[in-house]
Amino acid sequence: MENIENIEVYPHNVEEFARYAHRGQKRKYSDLDYVTHPIEVASRVQDLYDNMNMVAAALLHDVLEDTDVTHSELRVWLHEEFRPEKAEAILLLVVELTDVYTKHNFPFLNRKQRKKLEADRLAMVSREAKQIKLIDIEHNSESILQEDPSFAKVFLEEKEYLLDAMESYMLRN
């Protein structure tokens, strides 16, 4: 019995946690609540993959990076909601999707340097994390192209390097 959790409850509880974590945040360029982004990413993940861990991670993919929720708090909550192995699998995906090379963590690096290091790091994450990241990039690209065409050029160049790094790593391994 691999999937004991009620699938109807599973993403709903995670979505509620994401809503709580992102409360008060707005999407850049719009008045939409920020949580609409991870919800859309999760919806696309669910449409493409039959993997509820990926759906949960997609809902939570920006929680550690963009909210006050700590790794420990997320781990505790996941363990309250799911069996230990499922909680850890979701947490691992969220950690893989969380930017390491941020301005806060690496203030001495410029944006281009940080994005290159982040792309190189993301090239080595799990296949599931890569699949979520690609959908995240797709959704962000749509928004940026529509709302800030001048920044879109920079954003898309950074993502092109990331996609090349991911492809290169996958071809080597």
Predicted regions and their residues:
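Active-site helical microenvironments for divalent-metal-assisted chemistry
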Residues: 1-173
